[in-house]
Design a protein with these regions (language model features):
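Conserved catalytic core of two-metal-ion nucleotidyltransferases
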Residues: 1-27, 70-130, 150-246, 252-281
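Active-site nucleotide-donor binding segment shared across nucleotidyl transfer reactions
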Residues: 21-54, 58-64, 217, 244-245
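Conserved SAM-binding loop
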Residues: 66-68
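A short secondary-structure junction signal
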Residues: 132-137
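A contiguous, mid-domain pocket- or channel-lining segment that forms the substrate-recognition surface
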Residues: 140-144
Length: 281
């Protein structure tokens, strides 16, 4: 594996981000940087110095349109859209856009016949019910969706969740039954439409972030801010969103937490993943 050059990885991610944002603009799809990318745009006018990737939010309606339009209109020779379905489990809960001319093999995706290029994560935003009872059920369905869509045990979310998940996956072993449960859960958790809701939530970001809810008005539109050598979209209500999700986001974390979060078995920024089938098959 080539030595990881963080800046080169950032620039590859930026190139992908530019293409993705341009595609969304051309097809009237709303997208915005989220998480570390949004923080980086405001605090550093670019990447957080130790960060290496970009993630985007999209309202659910635009997210589903993206999945339909990509293979029809995008440069799929260069960039693949990967979305789990009945015949493909990629152990993610959301769409990823992959650069086919690179290789970035992640431990949890070894053995999968997918594009193993570096990825942009595209995360949907869904309506959040106002009632506590309905919200609890939405979160329950969100957890069921997370388990049966990703079909991996939650490593970072406590022993009880892991034990329950292991039991459920051992009971429901059939691919068809798992897919049926996953689609039922997805339908139940997404039944609250963004346009009809006062708040929105991120149900595909794992147990911690799915508990967050944000004012819909924060995401009704985007604004463009400086990001490296370009402009990138962030939510119009970025301050409310980032404070709710991360607290005092403009303050640097302690030095010991300023670390890249590489989780890769193999990385090559100059050669496509098809050159390394023996490593990921």
């Amino acid at each position: 594996m080539e030595e990881i050059n963080l800046r080169e990885l950032q620039l590859k991610s930026l190139e992908m981000g530019k293409y993705f944002v341009s595609f969304c603009e051309e097809n009237n799809l709303l997208c915005y940087l989220c998480g570390g990318g949004a923080i980086g745009s405001l605090r550093h006018s670019g990447f957080i110095p130790w960060d290496d990737d970009l993630d985007f939010f999209m309202p659910r309606e635009d997210y589903e349109k993206l999945a339909l339009l990509w293979n029809e209109k995008a440069n799929t020779k260069k960039y693949s859209l990967v979305k789990a379905n009945e015949n493909l489990v990629d152990h993610n809960l959301f769409i990823t856009i992959r650069d086919n001319d690179t290789t970035a093999i992640k431990p949890y995706q070894k053995g999968l016949d997918i594009s193993h290029g570096i990825a942009l994560d595209i995360i949907p935003l869904d309506g959040c019910p106002s009632g506590n009872y309905q919200r609890k059920f939405q979160l329950m369905w969100g957890l069921i969706y997370s388990l049966f869509c990703a079909q991996v045990l939650p490593e970072k979310h406590g022993g009880l969740k892991k034990k329950v998940s292991k039991i459920l996956l051992s009971i429901f072993k059939s691919k068809k039954i798992r897919y049926k449960i996953w689609k039922i859960a997805e339908k139940k958790m997404t039944k609250y439409k963004v346009k009809d809701s006062e708040y929105i939530t991120e149900l595909c970001s794992g147990p911690y972030y799915m508990k967050k809810k944000y004012k819909k008005e924060w995401f009704i539109d985007k604004i463009y801010v400086d990001f490296e050598d370009t402009k990138m979209p962030i939510p119009i209500g970025y301050d409310g969103y980032l404070k709710t999700a991360f607290g005092d986001y403009m303050t640097l974390p302690p030095k010991e937490k300023q670390l890249p979060h590489h989780d890769l078995l193999f990385l090559d920024l100059n050669n496509g993943y098809t050159n390394y089938k023996e490593l990921w098959k």
